[in-house]
Amino acid sequence: MKPIVRRGLGLLVIIIFSVIWMLSASMSRKDLRVRTCTGKETLDVIVKDSTERRFVEKEDIENWLEAEYRAYAGLRLDSVDLARIERIILGHSAVKTCQAWLTDDGSLHVELTQREPVLRFNEASNGYYSDADGFIFPLQSRFSVDVPVVEGAIPMSIPRGYKGEPATEQERVWLGQMLALTAHMNGGIWKTNIRHMNVEKSGNIILYPLEGKERFIFGAPVRIPEKFGLMEKYYTAVVPAVDAGKYSCVDLRYRGQLICR
């Protein structure tokens, strides 16, 4: 076959495939305009971490979309604003990530993950969680998580129902220190024994282990590994050498010293 003929055939093949692709794309766009969203009847919700936390369920997604998106059932597939649906769902404090998409049968699919609390703060008329990133969000009515609880003179001003980072740099620094303290506890032997902390007006953090009557004056949430090292020495060196229950207060604030009373 002559080269010019081969080139002509090659060009013809390219043209044919281009026409087929354009026709297919045109038909696909037309198909999207004809097909409609079936709404909550076929709404598919995947909560990826539902075995760990149950803050959000399918019913919540249905209610949020009904209240904030209004009628999406019956809309042409190319008219459903998926970005808006994701914004609506992400606007709820317990949701961390969200992705929405449609399938050819008209079904809306939503996949999400929930925020993971690591600390709970209890105030007189307010309660809220913080995740490991320092994002604060309200307690959830459906489900509570077993995490360490902080009470007392908490040096943060958090409005009821607030979600987001603390407003001031000073508050963000303090919260970061408390998260570092919690991470240290969760990474070692203290995870199951210390579930309650109290903040005194002086700013001192008091730790209350589940076992024993001792309370530990931690002071400010700084020099964290050093202070937990002192706490461990109390249990390994002091407790075996004295009568059970002799001390009720152990001060960890001073470098290299344990003050027991």
Question: Which stretches of residues belong to each language-model region?
Answer:
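Charged, solvent-exposed interaction patches on well-folded alpha/beta domains
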Residues: 1-49, 56-60, 65-91, 96-261
